[in-house]
């Protein structure tokens, strides 16, 4: 685990974005942990979040021309990541996001920001079912751009309805790499370093055993 990944876990714990306990997911599964990126909700949170996304993007080595943030959660993430790339990595990358509703005046259309072209890095919080990715792919392809990769905060590394995770399905269907700041394996490695979290470690490992990929 790299230092920025450990720092991200601590950041998520401090903001109660990452919690341990008993949680019922939309899938109906009982999960021993829960991740709610919506609780990164202050200016400082967003500034730090952008730095973690930028760090993981640069670390991945994936080549891209533009950041795309799908409405709505992806919009602030794309914005803060673009700022962090410029401020901390000397990479001035254009960004773009979509509107849910098309507009018939002003800029018009359903895209805001730079023209959607070239190799696109899609940034979002998490991938649960992959539905948002499919919707974004339609927009990207309609504009003649290509998907370079997908960047998220957490890869839960768990099976969907079949044998693959939602992330593995996205990688298979679109031939792109999904980059995550942290994965479930990173989370388990972090818990293993903390004796006071031994009970959470056992629960998360049991969950991985049952649902992991």
UniProtKB/Swiss-Prot annotation:
One of the protein's GO biological processes: pyrimidine ribonucleoside biosynthetic process
EC number: 2.4.2.10
A Pfam family: Pribosyltran
Catalytic reaction equation(s): orotidine 5'-phosphate + diphosphate = orotate + 5-phospho-alpha-D-ribose 1-diphosphate
The protein's annotated pathway: Pyrimidine metabolism; UMP biosynthesis via de novo pathway; UMP from orotate: step 1/2
Key words, A-Z: Glycosyltransferase, Magnesium, Pyrimidine biosynthesis, Transferase
Domain of life according to the entry: Bacteria
Cofactor(s) essential for the protein: Mg(2+)
SUPFAM superfamilies cross-referenced by the UniProt entry: PRTase-like
PROSITE patterns: PUR_PYR_PR_TRANSFER
Name of the protein: Orotate phosphoribosyltransferase
Listed GO MF terms: magnesium ion binding; orotate phosphoribosyltransferase activity
Top-rank EC class of the record's enzyme: transferase
Biological role stated in the UniProt entry: Catalyzes the transfer of a ribosyl phosphate group from 5-phosphoribose 1-diphosphate to orotate, leading to the formation of orotidine monophosphate (OMP).
Similarity-based family: Belongs to the purine/pyrimidine phosphoribosyltransferase family. PyrE subfamily.
GO cellular component: cytoplasm
């Amino acid at each position: 685990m790299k230092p920025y990944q450990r720092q991200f876990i601590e950041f998520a714990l401090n903001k109660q974005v990452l919690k341990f306990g008993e949680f019922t997911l939309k899938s109906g599964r009982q999960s021993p942990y829960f991740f709610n990126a919506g609780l990164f909700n202050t200016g400082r949170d967003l500034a730090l979040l952008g730095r973690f996304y930028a760090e993981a993007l640069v670390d991945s080595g994936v080549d891209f021309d533009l950041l795309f943030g799908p409405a709505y959660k992806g919009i602030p993430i794309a914005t803060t990541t673009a700022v962090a790339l410029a401020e901390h990595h000397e990479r001035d990358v254009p960004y773009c996001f979509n509107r849910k509703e098309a507009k018939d005046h002003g800029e018009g259309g359903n895209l805001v920001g730079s023209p959607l072209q070239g190799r696109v890095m899609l940034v979002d919080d998490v991938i649960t079912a992959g539905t948002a990715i499919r919707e974004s792919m339609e927009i990207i392809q309609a504009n003649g751009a290509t998907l370079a990769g997908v960047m998220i905060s957490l890869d839960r590394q768990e099976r969907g309805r079949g044998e693959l995770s939602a992330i593995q399905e996205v990688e298979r269907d679109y031939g792109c790499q999904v980059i995550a700041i942290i994965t479930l394996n990173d989370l388990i490695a972090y818990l293993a370093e903390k004796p006071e979290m031994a009970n959470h470690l056992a629960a998360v490992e049991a969950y991985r055993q049952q649902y992991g990929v």
